[in-house]
Regions:
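Transmembrane alpha-helices and immediately adjacent membrane-cytoplasm interface residues
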Residues: 46-104
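N-terminal signal-anchor/start-transfer transmembrane helix
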Residues: 6-26
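Alpha-helical transmembrane segments of integral membrane proteins, especially early/N-terminal helices
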Residues: 2-7, 49
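Polar-ligand-bearing catalytic/cofactor-coordination segments
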Residues: 22-27, 81-167, 179-250
Length: 294
């Protein structure tokens, strides 16, 4: 019974956290939402994957055919999760290599590259030297000077806060645990909100206008690659409404501590589940192969 509770805990945690995720995310300042959602997703994914492997090793040691068959199913699920994660990682690597083509173009001293393209778009290309902000003439020609500056500040915020890393961490976590798929939208919206607030430091009204105009112009533009951060077009209304209101309050410590506690508990579960795997596959000297926690 203790083993069942131990191995099912991360899946129950994933279900509860996913159910309450929008409400929980709202308790964090935009600057905190992205890293908190990302690292919680990674922690849940690792914990749930380790529980799959532990469950497989426990069931494989059963004498009944049903137990061994169930163990095989869990093993296949764990292997499939790894394959999906590796496949996504390869897609990300391909996208990163494709983005290097932008770095070969000339740019101004501010790290902004304007492409002669009628399709309106703006995105950030990460790089070791601080990255690159790419705009198309289709977008810049439709914006005022202040709105262009707001869009550039927005994209720079993505680079500064390394949102691409956090977004892809959640994407990988969702490949390992499909219950985390809704987290991908949440982290992308959080990244946009964080960048919006950074751009709004000069003028919230101008930032709201830039977001609304850019969202309207770019609504039909297909994201260029898997690393694109932009959320759903429907998120633009939420972002504009947030920018037309007061700036977010300072982050409360209790929410951060609560998130840290959840991550700590799940990390402990991963350790204990790993101990179950070790007990079954390579029991210590003097320890019965059947020994399991509890």
């Amino acid at each position: 019974v203790n083993v069942v509770i131990l191995l099912s805990a991360p899946w129950l945690a994933a279900a509860v956290l996913t159910w309450q995720l929008p409400r929980l995310a709202s308790r964090f300042h935009p600057d905190w939402q992205v890293p908190v959602v990302a690292w919680l997703a990674v922690t849940v994914a690792v914990s749930s994957w380790v529980s799959l492997v532990a469950g497989a090793t426990v069931l494989w040691n059963q004498s009944e055919f049903a137990g061994r068959a169930a163990g095989s199913v869990l093993a296949v699920a764990a292997a499939a999760a790894v394959l999906l994660a590796v496949r996504h990682a390869r897609n990300v690597r391909t996208s990163v290599r494709a983005n290097r083509a932008f770095r070969g173009h000339s740019r101004d001293e501010t790290g902004v590259l304007v492409l002669d393209d009628d399709r309106p778009d703006a995105f950030a290309v990460p790089g070791r030297s601080g990255g690159l902000v790419v705009l198309t003439t289709g977008l810049t020609d439709a914006l005022t000077a202040d709105e262009r500056r707001a869009v550039i500040d927005h994209e720079r915020a993505h680079l500064r806060h390394r949102h691409h890393v956090h977004v892809q961490a959640v994407e990988l976590a969702a490949r390992i645990n499909p219950m985390l798929r809704p987290w991908c939208h949440v982290v992308r919206l959080a990244a946009e909100r964080c960048a919006d607030e950074y751009a709004a430091r000069r003028d919230r009204r101008t930032a709201a206008q830039a977001v609304a105009r850019a969202a309207l112009l770019c609504a039909r533009v297909v994201a260029p690659d898997v690393c694109h951060i932009t959320g759903r077009p429907s998120d633009a209304r939420v972002r504009v409404m947030a920018l037309t209101g007061a700036p977010p309050e300072r982050q409360r410590r209790r929410a951060v501590l609560a998130a840290g506690l959840v991550a700590l508990v799940l990390s402990g579960q991963s350790y204990l589940a790993g101990d179950v795997i070790q007990d079954r596959l390579a029991p210590e000297a003097g320890e019965s192969p059947a020994t399991v926690i509890g």
